Amino acid sequence: MDSQKSQSSAMQIAEDMQETRAPELPGAGPVRRRTFLRGIGAAGIALSAGALVSDTVHAEEKSGSLTPGDAAILRFLAAAELIETDLWQQYAELGGLQTNEPPQITGLTTGNAAYTKALSNLDGDMATYIHDNTEDEFSHAAFINAYLKSKRADTVNLDQFRRLPSSQATGAQQIGRLTNLMELTVDTSWFTRYRSRTGNPDLGDSFANAIGVIGTKRHTAIPRNDNEAQLDPSSPNGVTDLTQFIANTAGFHFAFIEQGGTSLYAQLAQRVTNAEVLRILLSIGGTEIAHFQTWHDKAGNAPALKGVVDPVSGDTVDFPDLTTFAGNEDLQTNLIMPEPTFFLSKSFPVCSIIRPTATTNAAAATLKSFTDDGLFRGQGDDFFRYVNDLAEDADAARRGF
């Protein structure tokens, strides 16, 4: 290859490695991602493609046999799993099976009887499912970090950001949290998206919230105190309407979280280079799909409620009667398997698929969805800068780099 062609190839690689600016999170500020070309000036661009890649690998980090892109993707996934372990731990403390399984699950005590009862109205096995989902997320985070360490790549630790308050309800540990489950605005558009027979977010389509009441303003998905977790033998649900509304919100939030992981692993798998890393993403991603399918099914059992007063906001809210969705294929609760829809192009036959799976800004979009959900209300700018940086690195990854 002559020098002109070499320079042209290297410049093309540099152009290919530039990513559309990822959407910034609130509080993130003008943080620039640690691009894989950091430190390579104009003279460096004139290097051959092989030399450029070699210098990049050594300049960015010691990542063993991992490419910087694979390491960046795994780090973002480790952070996402740590965030999930934090929120699932809170659900497990209050509504899960109270069985400690070190090192994955610790700190469980008595649980919260009223909240657990309210969740059981969605399914009698909810406590077990919550416990198992929690254990799974802990195992994912621990494995990914251990794998990164084995490859001499940087790992992820979010302990410095565990600063958000805990619920004061019986069963909750009084420790710092990464996530806030008490001021959520739950996106339920996944419910209509997976029932659509013509729409696909990867093709520019948008979807309405199925449960509008929890998709506006702020709602708690765990009891904030014992006044919000009350048994009521006179109620058909065995708990107060407020406690049941909180559990209904949680039921839809469970599915929201896991549908995000379902897409994220499929999206980032398309960018990894190493076959073993691909195996990791496909293997863990499959469990996210199993989680989503479970919660999708249980959410549809949430009982109807009328005139529930939120003691914090003062709002009076109703939870819709989901049995009225019967016969409406856009909303029917038992249609939990993805309806076939357009994929890649509307010129192809419809196909039952996970959606979305397009890769552009996938990590940043995941963080934005968590932020819009209210998971990070109360977190500081330093947290947003850190996780936004991880997302930008993951989104900049390309197969082969």
Language-model-derived ranges and their functions:
Residues 2-31, 41-42, 57-401:
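All-alpha RGS (Regulator of G-protein Signaling) helical domain and cognate RGS-like helical scaffolds
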Residues 35-56:
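N-terminal export signals
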